[in-house]
């Protein structure tokens, strides 16, 4: 368990502006990783190996994209007990994102609203940081997902060019690549979830992936991250499109633009994506509908509203194969990672993924 109980540090962090606290933590993790300071947040990884999309994961609990946008803290995050970490979202060129303030806590709801807008240092810096990871260089069992998007200045008609540029850049470093087409904080980005736009984008991705697989001698799985604000008909069309283009999995879900559950709370009317406890039910519903549309064997990573071990289990029962945490980490601390992984392991064969025997 972590040597520094999160309950002691959370009041200090919550006394800061939400984004300032985020930046402080990222900076501390980046500076402290690979030093004795890392013991302050180190957890033992729960040994619950599974295989999905041709990849072996140490356990089913991962970190969602958005926390480590520039891949600065992979080694530190890997020490928290995650089975996989997803870094990004990265865009081809560096961009500042939307004006501040742009991240807000809703403590009563155990939620966050953000409208960051893919603020990141760009693809070149992202790849440089990936190359500095000792875990990656040492062949760690930790799986690494790299989440890619488009620059705000790129016209939607040319969006595929940004995704292709990022795919090309991150491909040698990724265990899987995630296409973020569902952030509500880049204007019109969610139109890429429409049938025709998605068909065009995924066709281009599939073609480029085939070229890269031949060049690098390995086929990197591609996942698509979707919104919770889609109806069943939209999900059915999307499922068919994903399968038609040989996409390897779906990440369900991103943040929501719906505010019904948090009406009346401070910051509830701020624009942006809502994450945390209020998203759990909607996310689980989308997971269930996707599982029905995609069938038993199609990989689903469930994310949205995991604030406890029981919430993580609910994602698996809804139809997810793996789960990801982000806002829960902010409210509950690193101990949630191990708690969730242990609870899922205790399910035994109840989840949709077959557990593999431990390797000595």
From Swiss-Prot:
Membrane topology type: Peripheral membrane protein
PANTHER family noted in UniProt:
DIHYDROOROTATE DEHYDROGENASE (QUINONE), MITOCHONDRIAL, DIHYDROOROTATE DEHYDROGENASE (QUINONE), MITOCHONDRIAL-RELATED
Q: How is the cofactor bound?
A: Binds 1 FMN per subunit.
Alphabetical GO biological process terms: 'de novo' pyrimidine nucleobase biosynthetic process; 'de novo' UMP biosynthetic process
One GO MF term on file is:
dihydroorotate dehydrogenase (quinone) activity
Q: What protein name does the entry list?
A: Dihydroorotate dehydrogenase (quinone)
Assigned EC number: 1.3.5.2
Q: Which NCBIfam families match?
A: PRK05286.1-1, PRK05286.1-2, PRK05286.1-4, PRK05286.2-5, pyrD_sub2
Lineage start: Bacteria, Pseudomonadati, Pseudomonadota, Betaproteobacteria, Burkholderiales
Cofactor(s) in the UniProt record? FMN
Per UniProt, FMN binds at 65-69, 89, 147, 180, 225, 253, 276, 305, 326-327
| Source organism per UniProt | Verminephrobacter eiseniae (strain EF01-2)
Q: InterPro entries annotated for this entry?
A: Aldolase_TIM, DHO_dehydrogenase, Dihydroorotate_DH_2, Dihydroorotate_DH_cat, Dihydroorotate_DH_CS
